[in-house]
């Protein structure tokens, strides 16, 4: 199997001053191309360290994607490190120098002398075009390893990987079929509870069951070779049966996007009133393109469940909205949810059984509970659901005549 690795460079990445989103993106992208990463390393802006790790990984990896260090400043050392590791010098790539000059001229800017550095490549390097920036990439062969050097700017990195590097890998190597990966997301059950129920299932050869906990949801993932696709799809029915009503969506689209699409398909507009969630619902749904009529964040105040239910019923009528959703303030470990629909208004009062979670986590959980309430109504299910340390203590329904 092809051994593919990644090397991230830069002090800011090494010291945690920025999150290495490029590494996460590449790992996911390559995985779905049948090229799962076998190792990832990070090195700071130190020439000796860079040269050492390039030489080391050249003895183990078939392909190494090096990210960062192709800029015009003194701490951009990737090209020099590659040349040093190979025992050769840097040469000026005249065509890229002219391309950079054109790039700056078209934008009404003068290219500084320091940018010339970005056109200096190891003598044996294969040039790799960057159509969206000034840092060209390049490839070198060092011992057994084909190394690709890429810019750190995420938009430039992704274009180069997708349009330049992946085609070269497909041309040079016989790549396996991409693996099958089935995903679903649950809300309301703990990871250990799900695992206890699912661990009894018999997995096909080479297939693994994965769990990813990211408060307030749990993602279940069944991954395996394409040859086992039929068996995996059959097993997936059992996984969904075991997960039951805790399943809130399949795939990777996300609940706000799926709700947005359902609202649009059924021509429902939505109005929101938030206290405890502080606009989080509006943010998530607006980013997903949901048909929102009006959104408000109001000061927190103590309300009975009936007050919340009547308030959101009136708000739906006043805004001529198809649906209206409310989250009340958080008072005495309790808060209210209410959903006004053409069928009537449904309201829940919940109690937090623990206070150990941060405000941000509690807001995220409550936003998800509200979205799940909406999802369940759209799917014709009972709108009541609980989440571990959140207990439904009261419910009520107002008829649509009110």
From Swiss-Prot:
Family, per entry: Belongs to the CinA family.
Output the superkingdom of the source species. Answer: Bacteria
SMART domains assigned: MoCF_biosynth
InterPro entries tied to this protein: CinA, CinA-like_C, Competence-induced_CinA, MoaB/Mog-like_dom_sf, MoaB/Mog_dom
- Organism from which the protein derives: Escherichia coli O17:K52:H18 (strain UMN026 / ExPEC)
Question: PANTHER family attached here?
Answer: NICOTINAMIDE-NUCLEOTIDE AMIDOHYDROLASE PNCC, NMN AMIDOHYDROLASE-LIKE PROTEIN YFAY
**Signal sequence annotation:** none
Q: Pfam family example for this protein? A: MoCF_biosynth
Q: Which HAMAP family match?
A: CinA_B (MF_00226_B)
Record protein name field: CinA-like protein
Annotated CDD domains: cinA
